[in-house]
Amino acid sequence: MCGIVGAIRAHHNVVDFLTDGLKRLEYRGYDSSGIAVNTDGKIKRVRRVGRVQLMEDAAREKGISGGIGIGHTRWATHGGVTEPNAHPHISGGMIAVVHNGIIENFESERKRLEGLGYRFESQTDTEVIAHSINHEYAQNGGKLFEAVQEAVKRFHGAYAIAVIAQDKPDELVVARMGCPLLVALGDDETFIASDVSAVIAFTRRVAYLEDGDIALLASDGIKRLTDKSGLPAERKVKVSELSLASLELGPYSHFMQKEIHEQPRAIADTAEVFLDGGFIPENFGKNAKSVFESIRSVKILACGTSYYAALTAKYWLESIAKIPSDVEIASEYRYRSVIADPDQLVITISQSGETLDTMEALKYAKSLGHRHSLSICNVMESALPRESSLVLYTRAGAEIGVASTKAFTTQLVALFGLAVTLAKVRGLVSEEDEARYTEELRQLPGSVQHALNLEPQIAAWAQQFAKKTSALFLGRGIHYPIALEGALKLKEITYIHAEAYPAGELKHGPLALVDENMPVVVIAPNDSLLDKVKANMQEVGARGGELFVFADLDSNFNATEGVHVIRAPRHVGELSPVVHTIPVQLLSYHVALARGTDVDKPRNLAKSVTVE
């Protein structure tokens, strides 16, 4: 959700980095872009609505170049999608700012600054930042770091900010509070970005800023850094494991397609910690054993796709580990009165580790007295793991497509491993049980590959969906969250309205929607609820509904008029939800192709939701 880049380079033009970095951040979602570069003592800016390429072409036409600059992709929050609202924002020709986040008190700050004589050219909260820093800069005699320090004291909300000044061609100042920002170090060049993917083509050496950090950067690195208390601090520089190849499409048409097909490897990599070392608490942290022994229940907080992974985990935690488990949407949890249990394990799930609502929900839980927290996350050094006492990283690798695929299935693998580990700590897993769970996990990548091989059959269904306006997804038990995930994927990238229900709820309302124009997708594995699901399907068929069934090889389904059947591998036991996720991902992808939508960058959506 918005992307920030910046650079100060001793020997090279910054424009190539700024435009390349912004293109690598396109997956985060945006509607406009811009850069500002200090060129011969003047700040030159170019902004455009639409793709980064349009802005890049304009920058080259204007001959913009220089050794220091900042750039931004905007996802509109305050103000419409217009060029005046695009970043960077400039105050008095002196200060240029890019900003990710929301300044909650921008209206009162705007009135204050207007009273001081500043004129506003946009509707954004970011212009408040530019004028506020410029005001402090003028007051303190041109000290950029101190101007940012003073200005941010007035802001309420979340932000990541990068600032340059017309008369400071060798200083770039950044500040972070609640939104991701990193510093990357090269040879006589220093970069900043919202995401490591923006800098990986230039350097792998990165330092992640923490909330409250303000840093003064030069081409030879970090010259000054203070923490939230205003005290000098240091941030450890690490070498990123991200590969440039993981950010390229390769032979695939879209990142979503690539990431769907990367799932056997991603699942195997995530499962490796359990297959090599066993289901042991130490996989989650040094103190995990004592924590797992002391907890009496589990609460999981997440948003979007991660929330559906959490709903799936609830079944495993209660059936395998016999531990009471509760799942809540993070954005709802943080605004209600909660009865806290200090012996409850709070689990947060986020692909990016920077989802603001999830992060704030965790902070809220800790403020209520929750002592134990565990994050399931795909990005090392992100905010959630730093805020949690325990962590398990999924090994999905970079996920560029806005619609989550491999991040979801690797979250399921991690949560399954957690459930078995908790059960083992609680003395509920026999050697035979553990051997069975281990073998199911070992066989999972192959079962997922088998499901991927169904793609031609699933693609053939796409044309039948392409002209529909609504769809219904049904599942029962642990496969109900997979129906929810399938409906979410369809609406995200095809713009077809889709809902998911437990199949047993058909008669309580959804059946009224069923007719010959309503495709009904059914998740129908060969488990203890199969006969119930078949009965629900009869109800749909009796109303003229058209059924699209994802079944197991041994489910005894026959395709008939109005009933289309695709068979996944034979039932794979507890991990069946992972396998049945693949067909609903492929269905959404191919329907999107048939409808001609932007698969990787669906309208109005962002990959990482770092604001409320």
Curated annotation (Swiss-Prot):
It is an enzyme of class 2 (transferase). PANTHER family: GLUCOSAMINE--FRUCTOSE-6-PHOSPHATE AMINOTRANSFERASE, ISOMERIZING, GLUTAMINE--FRUCTOSE-6-PHOSPHATE TRANSAMINASE (ISOMERIZING). Residues 2-220 form the Glutamine amidotransferase type-2 domain. The keyword Repeat applies. It is found in: Cytoplasm. Keywords: Aminotransferase, Cytoplasm, Glutamine amidotransferase, Repeat, Transferase. One of its GO terms (cellular component) is cytosol. GO terms for molecular function: carbohydrate derivative binding; glutamine-fructose-6-phosphate transaminase (isomerizing) activity. This is Glutamine--fructose-6-phosphate aminotransferase [isomerizing]. The lineage of its organism: Bacteria, Pseudomonadati, Pseudomonadota, Betaproteobacteria, Neisseriales. Its EC number is 2.6.1.16. Homodimer. Residues 288-428, 461-602 form the SIS domain. The active site is at residues 2, 607. It catalyses: D-fructose 6-phosphate + L-glutamine = D-glucosamine 6-phosphate + L-glutamate. InterPro entries: GATase_2_dom (IPR017932), GFAT (IPR005855), GFAT_N (IPR047084), GlmS/AgaS_SIS (IPR035466), GlmS/FrlB_SIS (IPR035490), Ntn_hydrolases_N (IPR029055), SIS_dom (IPR001347), SIS_dom_sf (IPR046348). One of its GO terms (biological process) is protein N-linked glycosylation. Catalyzes the first step in hexosamine metabolism, converting fructose-6P into glucosamine-6P using glutamine as a nitrogen source.
